[in-house]
UniProtKB/Swiss-Prot annotation:
The family this protein is said to belong to: Belongs to the NqrDE/RnfAE family.
InterPro entries hit by this protein: NqrDE/RnfAE, RnfE
A Pfam family recorded for this sequence: Rnf-Nqr
Main function: Part of a membrane-bound complex that couples electron transfer with translocation of ions across the membrane. Couples electron transfer from reduced ferredoxin to NAD(+) with electrogenic movement of Na(+) out of the cell. Involved in caffeate respiration.
Catalysis: reaction(s): 2 reduced [2Fe-2S]-[ferredoxin] + Na(+)(in) + NAD(+) + H(+) = 2 oxidized [2Fe-2S]-[ferredoxin] + Na(+)(out) + NADH
Species this chain originates from: Acetobacterium woodii (strain ATCC 29683 / DSM 1030 / JCM 2381 / KCTC 1655 / WB1)
Recorded name of the encoding gene: rnfE
EC number: 7.2.1.2
Any one of the GO CC terms: plasma membrane
Record keyword Transmembrane helix present: yes
Glycoprotein is among the record's keywords: no
UniProt-recorded name of the protein: Na(+)-translocating ferredoxin:NAD(+) oxidoreductase complex subunit E
Length: 196
């Protein structure tokens, strides 16, 4: 398969959040700010890259009847590594994301890419697919977190945009704000793609 096609597919055409609507639990829960969205996206991308490459490399030795438990073990190993690195180097982000880092193990984006792509493709294509899907997920979470942070706190990446006079829309940093923002973004993307 074409390396660049695999790389770019997950960013726009098959974006995990806006098109495939996968990974909704972390998407809705951690995107209260741009940095949280970006951090969760990057952590997921690292796990996705590691697990896709490992599963692709091991695909000929993993028996078909135990492939899902094998995928979970591989994914859990990479989640543990990423979790330990986050605790060591970005403890504030790790604390903000909390339980959602360990829950990457059962994130349907990672399991779906392992099952649908990495288990039946070579290492280079699996790497490209993981990077593309990971970038698409990171981009989606960062956009969602940015919109919610701007409207809900009047800041972006922690920097104040509007000063003390700004009246934040508190709904935007609460769960209903996540649903509202995600729904509007998905609707906008669907409208734009249907129009094109």
């Amino acid at each position: 398969m074409n390396f660049m096609k695999n790389l770019t597919r997950g960013i726009i055409r098959e974006n995990p959040t806006f098109v495939l609507v996968l990974g909704m639990c972390p998407t809705l829960a951690v995107t209260t700010s741009a940095i949280n969205g970006m951090g969760m996206g990057l952590a997921t991308m690292l796990v996705l890259i590691g697990s896709n490459v490992a599963i692709s490399a091991l695909r000929k030795v993993i028996p078909d009847n135990i492939r899902i438990p094998a995928f979970v073990v591989v994914i859990a190993s990479f989640v543990t590594i990423v979790g330990m690195l986050m605790k060591a180097y970005v403890p504030a982000l790790d604390a903000a994301l909390g339980i959602f880092i360990p829950l990457i193990v059962v994130n349907c984006i990672i399991l779906a890419r392992a099952e649908a792509f990495a288990f039946s493709n070579g290492i280079a294509d699996s790497f490209a697919d993981a990077v593309g899907m990971g970038l698409g997920f990171t981009l989606a979470l960062t956009i969602l977190g940015s919109i919610r942070e701007i409207l809900g706190a009047g800041s972006i990446f922690g920097f104040s945009l509007f000063g003390a006079a700004y009246e934040p829309v508190l709904l935007m940093i609460l769960p209903p704000g996540a649903f509202l923002t995600l729904g509007l973004l998905i609707g906008l993307i669907n409208w734009k793609t249907k129009k094109a």
